[in-house]
Amino acid sequence: MKYQQLENLESGWKWKYLVKKHREGELITRYIEASAAQEAVDVLLSLENEPVLVNGWIDKHMNPELVNRMKQTIRARRKRHFNAEHQHTRKKSIDLEFIVWQRLAGLAQRRGKTLSETIVQLIEDAENKEKYANKMSSLKHDLQALLGKE
């Protein structure tokens, strides 16, 4: 396993996940009867500061349909948690309009690069173009000064 599992931390994440799903109206318990489901949810809500007991609640009461989705969510959260420790692996997000993302993805595909590599290439191209324009402007100015003095 690439990322270490931290039981207390992950139990807190599981608790938050289940509470969020409950508030969104999903059935988080295995019980069909509303009173039994509400009773189990009340027990879960009381376990906020008891991360070790959350896993026991999950084994006993959780809706089996949520098992894989919760595992995926926790796995992704664990990855983000450990990647955030290092600057080079920390992910940043940017807001792009869909059409911009689509064009960037197309360019990346044509170049055989990732989106990040394509963005770096575009920045380098823009910087080189700027340097070239400054150099040409400087040469033009020097040439005009040279021709004007003769």
UniProtKB/Swiss-Prot annotation:
Name by which UniProt lists this protein: Macrodomain Ter protein
GO MF annotation terms: sequence-specific DNA binding
Subcellular location as annotated: Cytoplasm
GO cellular component: cytoplasm
A Pfam family matched in the record: MatP_C
InterPro entries per the UniProt record, alphabetical: Arc_rbn_hlx_hlx, MatP, MatP_C, MatP_N, MatP_N_sf
GO aspect biological process, one term: cell division
Record text on subunit structure and interactions: Homodimer.
Homology family: Belongs to the MatP family.
Keywords: Cell cycle, Cell division, Cytoplasm, DNA-binding
Role of this protein: Required for spatial organization of the terminus region of the chromosome (Ter macrodomain) during the cell cycle. Prevents early segregation of duplicated Ter macrodomains during cell division. Binds specifically to matS, which is a 13 bp signature motif repeated within the Ter macrodomain.
